[in-house]
Regions:
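Sec-dependent N-terminal signal peptides
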Residues: 1-27
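Active-/binding-site microenvironments in catalytic and ligand-binding cores
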Residues: 30-363
């Protein structure tokens, strides 16, 4: 059975008037995923669950209605089909970031018309809740006024970016690097978040499926298929093109505000695995959502987080997890503009499996 591994770090940072001191500790927690070796926690996998009853696509029957891939065997075939391994050379560590050209950055800059910026990070959650098993910790020292932040950012609560060494499939990372070659106690020797040191500046597109359906939020477990994306393109008058960043709003934070937190790791709206080929065909360079991207249960028998695996490990796509897209959705609707300049710049920790980020959308 295919094995997937998740890697993560715990971050402690001390800020003072005289400088910044940081330390990065390898998480002591381990997860076992379908026979995987010990791994870290973002998003923290759950034991494989029985297949969920089939669910119809949001907009009725269509090419994705067959829900391919449906099981581990089909997933393995699909992984090979959509893989970008070797596309930018056998030593590549940037993945789909290669799709963001100078011309693409200029196009993104041209989208700034009114100069209004919207931050996409959700405020750190300091309480232990069903969707936040690793609360953000903040302590302050009196006198010289220094403080310490401690955050295990991978998971279902804190806004962060996943590096390309975060997930392995069958013992390999993106571009075919082996687990033995990449994983060390001091971080990843390949594909670490430092490869994103110059950040992302590109055209961002908000995919607002609740607005498409005329609801405030999608119910947990709702899958988003290719036909849903294309229906939104038609409604919004936009088309996803090479080098774009695609952000999926499911309304997770709106639902949380209305009904309270729930165990998102077991039941969340998100993309179905069948969207991976479309993402490759359109040349999407960065992907994210207001949750952990995958629909859960996954609708792929015996597999958890198949979209994460396909995006990071097959396509070489960095992922923005747990973004707060509520204000962005409101501003986009107000302006009737669903495209904007998106900038994302994680701290370039050498060997890091990711980092907390506050992505900025500018209209």
């Amino acid at each position: 059975m295919p094995a997937r591994h998740l890697l993560g770090v715990v971050v402690a940072v001390t800020l003072s008037a005289t400088g910044v001191r940081g330390s990065f500790e390898r998480s002591a927690d381990a997860s076992q995923v379908q026979g995987a070796t010990p791994a870290a926690q973002s998003p923290q996998p759950q034991p494989a669950q029985p297949p969920a009853p089939p669910a119809e696509p949001l907009l009725g029957p269509g090419p994705s209605a067959a829900r391919y891939p449906k099981n581990a065997e089909e997933f393995d075939e699909y992984f090979k089909k959509v893989s970008n391994w070797g596309r930018w050379g056998k030593d590549d560590e940037r993945g789909a970031l290669n799709l963001i050209t100078e011309a693409k950055r200029k196009q993104a800059a041209s989208l700034v018309k009114v100069g209004l910026a919207v931050g996409l990070a959700h405020p750190p959650i300091t309480e232990r809740t069903p969707d936040n098993t690793n609360p953000f910790e903040h302590t302050m020292n009196r006198g010289f006024s220094t403080d310490t932040y401690r955050v295990s950012y991978h998971g279902y609560a804190h806004s962060h970016m996943d590096a390309l060494c975060h997930i392995l499939y069958k013992g390999q990372t993106y571009n075919g690097y082996s687990q033995a070659e990449v994983n060390t106690e001091k971080g990843c020797t390949k594909l670490g978040i430092q490869n994103m040191r110059n950040g992302y500046v590109t055209r961002g597109i908000l995919l607002d499926i609740p607005r498409l359906k005329g609801v405030q939020y999608l119910e947990p477990g709702t899958p988003v298929f290719v036909e849903d994306i294309e229906a939104w393109e038609k409604k919004a008058g936009i088309k996803v093109s090479s080098g774009d960043a695609l952000l999926l709003r499911t309304g997770r934070w709106a639902r949380r505000a209305a009904l309270g937190p729930w165990v998102v790791s077991r039941n969340e709206a998100g993309f179905h695995a069948s969207v991976a080929q479309w993402l490759k065909d359109r040349g999407v360079a960065l992907i994210g959502s207001d949750s952990a991207l995958d629909v859960t249960p996954s609708l792929v028998e015996s597999l958890n987080l198949p979209v994460h695996t396909l995006a990071i490990t097959a396509l070489g796509l960095n992922i923005l997890d747990n973004q707060d897209l509520e204000a962005l959705g409101e501003q986009a609707a107000k302006q009737n503009r669903w495209e904007f300049m998106l900038t994302v710049a994680p701290v370039p920790v050498t060997g890091g499996t990711g980092f907390p980020v506050n992505a900025i959308a500018t209209f």
